[in-house]
């Protein structure tokens, strides 16, 4: 479903604010998983199909189940709660992440996840596909006692800003004159969070929902009144979340999402009307940090981005779908890449989205990947001359020096680029039969994860470096190709 006013019934606002009685007409249903635990769920009210409030850790996350119920009561959203699994160390909201082929049948106690069952429960609660999932969690981290952290999927920076501002306004209004902690909200992608949720984002519930928010509250408040206050604040805030994300009354930029059986494709439109250039992250989950980098670089530069998530051995039965070419392969094997129907379909979908994002001819395509076998950035190219490569390298060195300065704790990574220099990772498969051959010019960046992504600070610095490099290099490369650049990077 696309998130626009056309998909929203005219009575939605009334439904949102006056559905506290909806629960009376939406019975709670139960499903047991023998020897492991049980689910409780309730279908979304009419007009709110696709929206689900989840509490995958039940009572193990203090009061998260009751908070999820109250939010579902208030909004009319569907409800999905899991009980009993966490105490047995059974994952609910994500599968077991596996890099190699694994058996399709499991028996207790080997089984470590009930994600497949939870996904079915979400579908029942949503009355179909999950357009918006909101998970409720509690933090056991004492350092996170002063804030609410929100992990997200499918949100733009502008949407995150609007949601943070809405929370601040609701909190300040309801907490005025009351003795309660003033919790800040830290929300992705606007801010980095301390909560590690990569499995949920790349393989779990935030992968399969078109848009998703996982909310983590402090373990406890100083008083029962504080608990009640923030339950009310969050309930009212989620009212706003549903309107902002589904109705988009502010006309904010939104990410277009294509959900597929083994993953998802996200398209971030150019914020500056740029045509002919696209950033790609075809291995956004397998190369774990590249999805986030592509999204942040797109925001900083205004260049359109297409990001693939999922399609890893976890989703594809031990195979990695290559996405930027019509093949798949088992990781760490020396065998050839396999052509398959599913790989061709996923590649076609990715290719078509790249061309749609380019808004015309694909003059320059930029692929972002990561690797861990060397310490240099390697850039494979198509259609780039030695002179152009030399200028890109010179720009990179200058920008790296400006941004890193004398900062000794972040390595100054060298860059090797074709055809100026020989590289080990030549991206030949994508050059011969993949996305790299379709653009007039292509650059395939392999970033050394142990250097550029080792810490949050390194990620931030190299994201800035990469964005600044594209701001300088892209206009030059496009002017060499077309004589002009449509749109502005500066």
What kind of feature is each model-predicted range?
Residues 2-11:
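Bacterial N-terminal signal peptides that target proteins for export
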Residues 19-21:
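C-terminal motif of bacterial Sec signal peptides marking the signal peptidase cleavage site
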């Amino acid at each position: 479903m696309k998130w626009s006013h056309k998909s929203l019934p005219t009575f939605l606002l009334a439904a949102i604010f006056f559905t506290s009685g909806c629960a009376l007409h939406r019975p709670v249903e139960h499903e047991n998983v023998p020897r492991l635990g049980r689910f409780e769920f309730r279908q979304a009210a009419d007009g709110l199909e696709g929206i689900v409030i989840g509490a995958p850790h039940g009572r193990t996350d203090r009061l998260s189940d009751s908070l999820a119920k109250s939010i579902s009561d208030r909004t009319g959203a569907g409800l999905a709660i899991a009980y009993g699994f966490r105490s047995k160390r059974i994952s609910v909201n994500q599968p077991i992440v596996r890099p190699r082929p694994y058996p399709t049948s499991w028996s207790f106690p080997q089984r470590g996840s009930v994600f497949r069952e939870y996904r079915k429960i979400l579908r029942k609660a949503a009355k179909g596909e999950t357009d918006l999932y909101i998970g409720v969690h509690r933090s056991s981290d004492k350092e996170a006692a002063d804030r609410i952290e929100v992990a997200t999927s499918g949100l733009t920076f502008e949407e995150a800003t609007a949601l943070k501002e809405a929370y601040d306004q609701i909190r300040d209004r309801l907490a005025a004159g009351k003795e309660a902690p003033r919790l800040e909200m830290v929300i992705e992608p606007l801010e980095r969070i301390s909560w590690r949720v990569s499995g949920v984002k790349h393989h779990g519930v935030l992968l399969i929902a078109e848009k998703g928010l996982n909310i983590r509250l402090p373990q406890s408040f100083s008083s029962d009144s504080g608990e009640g206050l923030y339950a009310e604040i969050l309930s009212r805030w989620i009212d706003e979340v549903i309107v902002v994300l589904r109705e988009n009354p502010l006309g904010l930029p939104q990410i277009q999402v294509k959900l597929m059986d083994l993953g998802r494709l996200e398209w971030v439109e150019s914020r500056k009307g740029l045509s002919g250039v696209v950033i790609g992250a075809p291995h956004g989950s397998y190369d774990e940090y590249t999805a986030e980098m592509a999204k942040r670089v797109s925001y900083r530069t205004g260049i359109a981005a297409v990001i693939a998530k999922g399609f890893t051995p976890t989703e594809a039965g031990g195979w990695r779908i290559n996405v930027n070419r019509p093949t798949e392969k088992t990781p760490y094997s020396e065998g050839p890449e396999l052509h398959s129907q599913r790989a061709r379909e996923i590649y076609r979908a990715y290719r078509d989205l790249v061309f749609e994002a380019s808004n015309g001819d694909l003059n320059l395509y930029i692929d972002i990947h990561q690797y861990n076998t060397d310490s240099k950035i390697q850039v494979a190219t198509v259609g780039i001359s030695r002179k152009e490569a030399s200028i890109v390298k010179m720009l990179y060195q200058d920008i790296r020096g400006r941004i890193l300065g004398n900062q000794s704790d972040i390595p100054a990574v060298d860059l090797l680029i074709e055809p100026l220099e020989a590289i080990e990772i030549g991206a030949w498969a994508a050059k011969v039969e993949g996305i790299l051959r379709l653009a007039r010019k292509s650059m395939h960046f392999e970033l050394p994860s142990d250097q550029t992504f080792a810490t949050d600070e390194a990620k931030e610095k190299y994201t800035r470096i990469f964005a600044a490099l594209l701001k300088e290099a892209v206009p030059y490369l496009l002017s060499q190709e077309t004589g002009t650049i449509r749109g502005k990077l500066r």
